[in-house]
């Protein structure tokens, strides 16, 4: 069972907060990368997409603190470091998420459904 729509991410986007998300089963792609939302290909490395950054899904295995990070965790570190150190990239995604927020309104959703139905 998976949550169909990540409300916290949608709220962050509406507030203009740059987002990093794992490429989980539902929601993140639809919000951050609508152009590839239908792709079945899983993200294998940190990927800058239109409205944020997607990283691979972690295994969920629990490790002790001294064990090395798994590859997906290293990709998450890269994404976090990028946004922390690159103010231009951070500002770019602040602007992009603000424009994406306008599409996440009720009106935007209704218009998109009407487009789909009329096709």
Tell me what each language-model feature is.
Residues 6-14, 29-33:
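Short alpha-helical segment that forms part of, or immediately flanks, the ligand-binding pocket
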């Amino acid at each position: 069972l998976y949550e169909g729509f990540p409300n916290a991410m949608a709220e962050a986007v509406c507030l203009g907060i740059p987002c990093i998300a794992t490429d989980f089963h539902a929601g993140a792609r639809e919000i951050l990368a609508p152009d590839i939302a239908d792709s079945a290909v899983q993200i294998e490395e940190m990927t800058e997409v239109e409205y944020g950054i997607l990283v691979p899904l972690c295994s969920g295995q629990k490790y002790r603190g001294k064990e090395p990070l798994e590859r997906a965790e290293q990709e998450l570190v890269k994404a976090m470091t990028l946004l922390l150190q690159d103010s231009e990239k951070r500002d770019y995604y602040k602007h992009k998420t603000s424009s994406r927020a306008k599409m996440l309104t009720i009106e935007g959703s209704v218009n998109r459904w009407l487009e789909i139905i009329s096709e």
